[in-house]
Each structure stands twice: as C-alpha cells, then as structure tokens.
C-alpha cells in the first residue's frame, strides 16, 4: 500500500465522533496518490466536501479522498498504486484549511488508516 499524502494528522480517526478518516495537513496542490491499484467509482464535486474521488480496490477495499483542489481521474478510470489522482485543496463547506480527508473502508466498515499507513514525512 502507498500513502496518499504525507504530513501531520490534524484530526485522527474517531468512531465515537463519526470521523471515519484521518485529516492530513498538506500544502495547497500537493499531489494526492492512489494507495493501490484500483478503479475510480466516484469523481465529482460535492457541496460539503469539495472535490471527492473514491477508488475501489481488490478484497472489498474502498479509499476515499476529500477536499481536493482538482481531480485528475474520472469515473471508470483504472489507476495504479502511487499514481496521482488529485491535488490537495481546501474545498467544500466542511473544510477548515488545506488538508486531505482520507477514509479507508473494508467490506462496508470504516478502518483506521493509521493502522495501515505511516503519514510521517520523516
């Protein structure tokens, strides 16, 4: 698996608070990368979370990337692990600064991305 972006975590995964993601602080237009080979199943603008892209991977895994400045792939595209799929931004009503809101789902259940990735820049 390939980390989508590197940077400090501003808000961790928290089931009790229904924050099914990690928020990774990044600079504007940081390349956002696919965590694994997959297919784009959603690539659109949403009012609350800005430009969103969702990838479907093997073994029932979905990866979700929100608040992007732009998307470089469209629905139906195949992507490779580490391929740039978006640029980081601060889009959508719920964004509080430049960051990547990154979700990982397995068989319909949210997973803590920090159990699978090291987001540290060191």
Where in this protein do the model-derived segments appear?
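Residue-level recognition of beta-strand microenvironments
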Residues: 12, 43-44, 71, 88-91, ...
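Short, acidic/hydrophobic/Gly-rich beta-strand patch recurrent on exposed beta strands
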Residues: 22-25, 52-57, 101-103
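Conserved beta-strand positions that form and line the central face of beta-propeller blades
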Residues: 23, 54, 64, 87, ...
């Amino acid at each position: 698996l390939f980390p989508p972006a590197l940077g400090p975590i501003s808000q961790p995964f928290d089931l009790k608070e229904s924050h099914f993601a990690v928020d990774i602080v990044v600079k504007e237009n940081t390349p956002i990368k696919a965590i694994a080979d997959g297919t784009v199943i959603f690539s659109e603008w949403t009012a609350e979370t800005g430009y969103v892209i969702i990838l479907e991977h093997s073994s029932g895994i979905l990866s979700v990337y929100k608040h992007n400045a732009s998307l470089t792939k469209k629905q139906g595209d195949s992507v490779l692990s580490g391929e740039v799929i978006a640029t980081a931004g601060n889009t959508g009503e719920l964004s509080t600064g430049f960051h990547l809101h990154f979700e990982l789902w397995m068989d319909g259940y949210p997973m803590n991305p920090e159990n699978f990735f090291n987001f540290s820049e060191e």
